């Protein structure tokens, strides 16, 4: 199975599927459609039915039930796109039999346990890394490879009882648009799981409440030599705004259940400047308070500098899926039992981020998140353990079987 996983993953990783905020098309990039078409053909070749890809790039397929029991339909999902933070073009995956120490990625870059201490725990594993020039795309092509391999395994092992299984691969998850055009009714599952987590055993059914903010500043540009009492520097107004947010409530200073404000980008000149933020908090009231604080700062600056000099736009992105999953704890219990049967110690904790499941849970499809085996996502030091990918495959298989066993 390991070689199948390696072959699938490296094949998918080589397709450039980075999404982009700059596009309003669905999906936002052609590469996602390219990978979707590849998966459609592979799903058909495996023997799945009802294989579709719609105009928006959503791929869906069915593995039919092999039992006469009335088993609820379950789903497994992963996303097609890779992150925007680092290039995903010309990905060249490297396979290593890791025996400890540093890994030479190439181009002068080294993956070292001195910088990434968790690497030492992977001694004896088969690892896939980058060549140092791109991200790897294990987020979330590891999840795609695991779902595909699990479906193949179930087809080849008809003695493993399971109900109807739906799989889906979604575009634009990394920019928060994954579920925007996802047809929950057409998918037809009672509940689902995303394969979009990190290290072995990770299981998550709590996510941030999330919003985006755009703050605009309007200045007056004049020649700096004759600017006295005339120039209004919009960049300085932007700095003034940012300085009023709590400095210690940023990603680099927070962990666990702590929320934050994150300045994603700053652009502009003396005439006009713009700040782009994301706002995150697990608690719904604290989330509301954070948004209110940003609005209050903008309002105070309006009062100080004049109307029309500062504007703010806030947009909610997704909410904490715990509110939708906790009432159906059997979804969690089945996944944890599936891991424990493999000797995996489940590591249940919050996602300091979001998945497609965050939004899908609010669209009527409760969807917690399962590990894929990857580390250091979104950069050149990203890697994934093939050994732990294989365990993720068996978690999928066990979930399908346990749901069938629990049915009458």
Swiss-Prot record:
Superkingdom to which the source organism belongs: Bacteria
GO cellular component: cytosol
EC numbers: 3.4.11.4
Cofactor: Zn(2+)
Subcellular location: Cytoplasm
Record SUPFAM superfamilies: Bacterial exopeptidase dimerisation domain (SSF55031), Zn-dependent exopeptidases (SSF53187)
Entry's Gene Ontology molecular function annotations: metallopeptidase activity; tripeptide aminopeptidase activity; zinc ion binding
Record keywords: Aminopeptidase, Cytoplasm, Hydrolase, Metal-binding, Metalloprotease, Protease, Zinc
Single GO BP term: proteolysis
InterPro entries (UniProt xref): ArgE/DapE_CS, Bact_exopeptidase_dim_dom, Peptidase_M20, Peptidase_M20_dimer, Peptidase_M20B
CDD domains, alphabetized: M20_peptT
Chain residues that bind Zn(2+) 2: 139, 174, 378
UniProt-annotated catalytic positions: 81, 173 (proton acceptor)
Family: Belongs to the peptidase M20B family.
Function, in words: Cleaves the N-terminal amino acid of tripeptides.
Name of protein: Peptidase T
